[in-house]
A protein has these predicted regions:
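Conserved SAM/SAH-binding beta-strand->alpha-helix loop
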Residues: 117-121
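A short acidic, Gly/Pro-enriched loop at the edge of an enzyme's catalytic core
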Residues: 141-152
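Conserved SAM-binding loop of SAM-dependent methyltransferases across substrates and taxa
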Residues: 97-109
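N-terminal auxiliary segments of SAM/dcSAM-dependent transferases
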Residues: 1-48
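Conserved class I S-adenosyl-L-methionine
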Residues: 86-96
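Conserved Class I S-adenosyl-L-methionine
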Residues: 217-271
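Class I SAM-dependent methyltransferase Rossmann-like catalytic core
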Residues: 45, 50-74
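Conserved beta-strand signature within the Rossmann-like core of class I S-adenosyl-L-methionine
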Residues: 172-182
Length: 271
C-alpha cells in the first residue's frame, strides 16, 4: 500500500481510475505517462520550476553511461546495511530524471519506491525508465507523503526541508544524504573559474542523529567530447562560464574528473 498524501490536507489519497482522491475530495489526475502532479501552485517559484531541459537531457545521457555508478552503489549498500526484513517505503528526494531512483527499484524490487522532483519535465523523463516507481511532481517543502510512513529518504545533491523529513519518516527512519565536498569536480572548476571559492559544509549538517558519515573519492576518465560536455551541462558551473572562457569548451576532447562526496546516514529518534 502506497503512502501518498494530498498536498493540501495531508490526508491519504486513493486511486480511482486515472485519478487520486483524498477524503476531502481533493483530486489529482494521473498524466498519460503515469506520473502524479502533486505540486500546488503556491509551491511554485516559477511556471516551470526545476532544472532546464538542456541540463536534464545532458544528465540522463551522462549518467546512463555509468560514470556515477559508484555513487548509486554506495547508496544501495547503505540501505542494505540498515534495512530490516520488512517491506520498505523509500523516497528519492529531488530525483531529477530518475537515474538513481530507477537503480534503487532494480535492487529493491519488492519495496515501494517514490521519486519526487519539482520539475515536471524531469519526472516526465523519469517515467521512461520504469512505471514501477511512484513518480511524483512535488515540493520538498510540502511532501505529498502521509506522516511517519517512510523507512528511508535518499537525498543526493538536492535541497531538503528538515521539518518535512521529520514529519514523513517513521520513528527510527533513515536519511541518506549525499553532498559534494569542496574538491568534487575540481577539474571543472579549474577549467571554468579564474578563482575557486571553497564553500564550508557547516550548514549542510542535519538536525538528526548521525549514524555514519564518510567521504567517497573516486577518479573518472571521460575519453570523449560528448560525455565531457554532458557532464558540464548537468552542473551549474556550465551556466556560469564567462564569455571569455567559453573557448575552452571548443578544445575539450576528454576530461579526467574527481568524484569527492560525503555520504551521511542520519536516523530519526526511535522514542
Amino acid at each position: 500500500m502506497h503512502k501518498l498524501a494530498c498536498p493540501k490536507c495531508h490526508e491519504s489519497i486513493v486511486q480511482e481510475g486515472n485519478s487520486y482522491k483524498c477524503a476531502n475530495n481533493h483530486c489529482y489526475d494521473l498524466a498519460k505517462t503515469k506520473y502524479l502532479n502533486l505540486l500546488l501552485n503556491p509551491d511554485k517559484a516559477t511556471n516551470n520550476p526545476g532544472d532546464s531541459k538542456e541540463s536534464l537531457v545532458a544528465r540522463k545521457a551522462y549518467l546512463t553511461k555509468g560514470y556515477y555508478d559508484v555513487i548509486l552503489k554506495s547508496v544501495i549498500d547503505c540501505i542494505k546495511k540498515y534495512r530490516d526484513d520488512t517491506p520498505l517505503d523509500i523516497l528519492d528526494l529531488g530525483c531529477g530524471e530518475g537515474y538513481y531512483t530507477r537503480g534503487l527499484k532494480e535492487i529493491f524490487s519488492l519495496d515501494t519506491i517514490y521519486g519526487l522532483d519539482i520539475s515536471k519535465e524531469a519526472i516526465n523523463m523519469a517515467t521512461k525508465y520504469t512505471k514501477d516507481v511512484y513518480w511524483l511532481v512535488g515540493n520538498s517543502k510540502n511532501l505529498p507523503i502521509v506522516d511517519h510512513s517512510l523507512d528511508f529518504i535518499t537525498a543526493l545533491f538536492t535541497v531538503i526541508n528538515q521539518d518535512e523529513l521529520k514529519r514523513t519518516l517513521k520513528k527510527g527512519g533513515y536519511i541518506i544524504h549525499v553532498t559534494a565536498n569542496p574538491n568534487h569536480l575540481i577539474e571543472i572548476k579549474e577549467l571554468i573559474y579564474d578563482e575557486i571559492k571553497v564553500k564550508s559544509d557547516k550548514y549542510i549538517r542535519l538536525d538528526f542523529e548521525t549514524i555514519e558519515s564518510y567521504d567517497l573519492v573516486h577518479q573518472v576518465k571521460i575519453d570523449n567530447r560528448e560525455d565531457a560536455l554532458n557532464l558540464l551541462k548537468m552542473t551549474p558551473h556550465y551556466y556560469h562560464i564567462k564569455k571569455e572562457r567559453r573557448g575552452v569548451l571548443d578544445e575539450l576532447e576528454r576530461l579526467d574528473i574527481t568524484i569527492d562526496i560525503k555520504i551521511t546516514i542520519y536516523q530519526t529518534s526511535i522514542d
